[in-house]
Each structure stands twice: as structure tokens, then as C-alpha cells.
A protein has these predicted regions:
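Active-site beta-loop-alpha junctions enriched in small/polar residues
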Residues: 17-19, 55, 89-93, 122-125, ...
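Short, acidic/polar
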Residues: 30-41, 98-111, 161
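Acidic-and-aromatic substrate-binding clefts and catalytic sites of carbohydrate-active enzymes
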Residues: 53-65, 93-99, 127-132
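CE4/NodB-like, metal-dependent polysaccharide N-deacetylase domain
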Residues: 101-121, 143-147
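Conserved small/polar residues in nucleotide/adenosyl-binding loops
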Residues: 162-169
Length: 169
């Protein structure tokens, strides 16, 4: 595939919304071995992006998807692990405010994912209920990068119409 006359690597990702979600997906921890096999099969077939979120999981299983991925990564050969990108999304819950609102959730996600975190995304826009919250959280992600954490910043489920001006170029 060419984009602006440059070859672009084709990517296919494994989404993990259902992992840990009892409410919508009837998750049971008894099925974790099946999820491990799904993960392994995805890697065998060339999937190189694993998508998750700190909110994937319900109730006391919050973050369960990240925890499972982190566990599976421990048994992934290092050559395969290097080619995988792990993307998570941090939920802009109303209590996560200000330019430090993502610090704790980011560190918890990093821990659950065993320090394999390549892309961190704002999960959805706050424009409809707390428009002032969004810019602070995006700046917080930039601050984390400035502190030495190495990841790309992304947006998920956000229409560009609702995004704040770029926190930093």
C-alpha cells in the first residue's frame, strides 16, 4: 500500500473490549485460557497491534483486559514482543481532572501491561459534559512524555470537531 508515495506497513489489530466484561460479553475467568489462545493465534497470523483500555472490564474487573494482556506478554518471545504495539485508552472519567488527572491511571495501566505500552489514547471526548477537562488531560499525557515515558499519544472515539486545540505540537 502506498501513501504519499511511501510504502506503509499494513496493520491489523486485536481488540479486547470483551476481555473482563461480564455485563456485555458474559466474561468468565474460566475462559482466560481461551483468551490466551486467541492472543497467541492473533500473533501467529501477523496481528501486531493489541488494543485495550483501562475501562475494559466491569465492576471489580476494571482493567482486566490490560491485566490479561500483560500476563500474556510475559510469555511472548522477545522477538515477537518487539514487533507488537500495545495501545491503551484512558477514560476521561469526571474525577480525572486537571493536568495530573491521568498520572495514576497511566501508571496503573503501565503496571498491568508489564511496561509494554506504545500508544496511549484519550478514550472519548469530554466536550459535551466537561469541555475544559480535555485539554488538561491531553497536556498531562504530554507531561508524562516529558518525564521520560516513551509512547505515542492518540485520540479514540473523538470527532475532530470536538477536540481542543493541540496541547503541544
Amino acid at each position: 500500500m502506498l501513501y504519499l508515495n511511501r510504502p506503509v506497513k499494513k496493520r491489523i489489530g486485536l481488540g479486547t473490549w470483551s476481555w473482563g466484561n461480564k455485563l456485555f460479553w458474559n466474561y468468565k475467568s474460566l475462559n482466560d485460557d481461551d483468551l490466551r489462545e486467541t492472543y497467541n493465534e492473533a500473533l501467529r497470523r501477523g496481528f501486531d497491534l493489541i488494543d485495550t483500555a483501562d475501562s475494559y472490564g466491569t465492576g471489580n474487573l476494571q482493567g482486566r483486559s490490560e491485566l490479561l494482556i500483560g500476563k500474556f506478554l510475559l510469555n511472548t518471545p522477545s522477538a515477537k514482543k518487539k514487533r507488537i504495539q500495545v495501545a491503551t485508552k484512558l477514560a476521561p472519567y469526571p474525577w480525572r481532572i486537571g493536568d495530573r488527572g491521568f498520572n495514576k491511571p497511566f501508571l496503573k495501566s503501565l503496571e498491568r501491561l508489564n511496561n509494554k505500552l506504545d500508544i496511549v489514547q484519550l478514550h472519548w471526548s469530554t466536550a459535551k459534559y466537561n469541555p475544559w477537562q480535555e485539554l488538561g488531560l491531553l497536556n498531562n499525557l504530554c507531561d508524562l512524555k516529558d518525564e521520560g515515558f516513551d509512547f505515542q499519544i492518540g485520540l479514540s472515539n473523538i470527532c475532530l470537531l470536538y477536540t481542543s486545540p493541540s496541547p503541544r505540537d
